[in-house]
Amino acid sequence: MIDSAAMKAELLRAIYAWDRLRFALWRRRFGARLEVGAAVSPNLRFTDLRVESGARFVVGPGYATERRRGNHVWVQSGGALALGPRVWLRTECGPNYVTVAEGARIELGARCLINGAMLHANIGIRMGDDSMIGFGSRVLDSDFHHLDIRTPERSSPVTIGERVWIASDVTVLQGVTIGDDVVIGARAVVTRDVPSGVLALGHPARPVRSLGPRARLPE
């Protein structure tokens, strides 16, 4: 009698071994520009990845993503993208777009979740541990263009604290600091700093109520 469970387990082991081999070969293309920690999902190789000369992409241990081509990452010359332990670039709701301009830096803390969002840094974006960005949201540290002949393009780093939840279709603009334990409601536009421990809503986003600590939320 054929042991179907054993056959399935053997097939899964073979698929996993093949994935690891292909992942190792894929990593070699980037050399020292790509640094990968332990227990990183081999699905990383499905990333549409460009890491230019002099740039670095550091992937912390336990990185996760799905087995699809939903992540688009471009680290330009002299730029750096650093993902902390157990970061999840989730693609089930849509693609993620992460762009690091020349000399800029994006840093995501431990256990951050990016779910179908866009991050673009001309100078820098930093997210603290256990923070999340929802589907269709954007974090931009620059205007990208001159407003007029008298108003040049402006860039200023963005800082997002720990245990922050940025909901769907939110825009976070340059120079903003968001404190710890904050929730930014859907479709908000964040143009100014948000203090810790609040729910912020609207255009522009303003605190509407205080929140308790988010450190002990259920899994």
List the predicted regions and their residue ranges.
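Domain-scale signature associated with acetyltransferase and cell-envelope carbohydrate enzymes
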Residues: 1-140, 161-163, 170, 180, ...
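Conserved catalytic-core motifs of eukaryotic protein kinase domains, centered on the activation segment
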Residues: 143, 150-151, 176, 194, ...
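Flexible glycine-rich beta->alpha loop in the catalytic core of nucleotide-sugar glycosyltransferases
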Residues: 144-145, 188-189, 195
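Short hydrophobic beta-strand segments in globular cytosolic domains
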Residues: 167, 173, 185, 190-191
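Glycine-rich NAD(P)-binding loop of Rossmann-like domains
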Residues: 152-161
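A short, glycine- and basic residue-enriched loop/turn
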Residues: 157-158, 175-176, 191, 197
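A mid-sequence, solvent-exposed acidic-amphipathic segment
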Residues: 147-150, 165-167
